[in-house]
Amino acid sequence: MFNDQVGLDSQWFIHNDIRPCSLFEVNVNPCKKRKTYCDAEYWLKSIRTGQGYIEPVMLSYDIECLLRPGEFPDPKRDPVITIGCYTKTESKCFCLQETPGYDSFPTETAMLKAFLRYVQRVSPDILTGYNINRFDNTYIETRCKKLGIDFKWSRMRGHVSSIQHITTHSNQKGTQ
């Protein structure tokens, strides 16, 4: 592996001997104007890796869409009807229309807004799921745009998120 194949953020971690999900010893100054939804914000003066490990918060989700028989779902036309979510401490299901025992919403817009608020509340370090990078993330982003919903699941206040599309290649899976 060559230096130009390692992202700048990863290079910073390597050069500063920072191990993600470790405990850290830091010197900070409090921020006067908050820019995130985090509990506290600080300007970092210095950092050193300490001992121990912090388990990352993971949120796994999957969507189901209403589709036409024999066709693949199209986010420009077919609504999301269910979003199932799972964390280590809870599971949640957002459903379009009345579904006993689950969080039900009269419109897709209301359901997607509730899901985005949930993602912000959970504030996951890792957002995962089956095929989310090749389907679910883009589908939700497209539906939000179509319905006029700000796609906000960032920790940054006022930041409208966007899905970054990347192409990968391996001998096993080919180009994706």
Which stretches of residues belong to each language-model region?
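The two-metal-ion catalytic cores of nucleic-acid processing enzymes
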Residues: 1-176
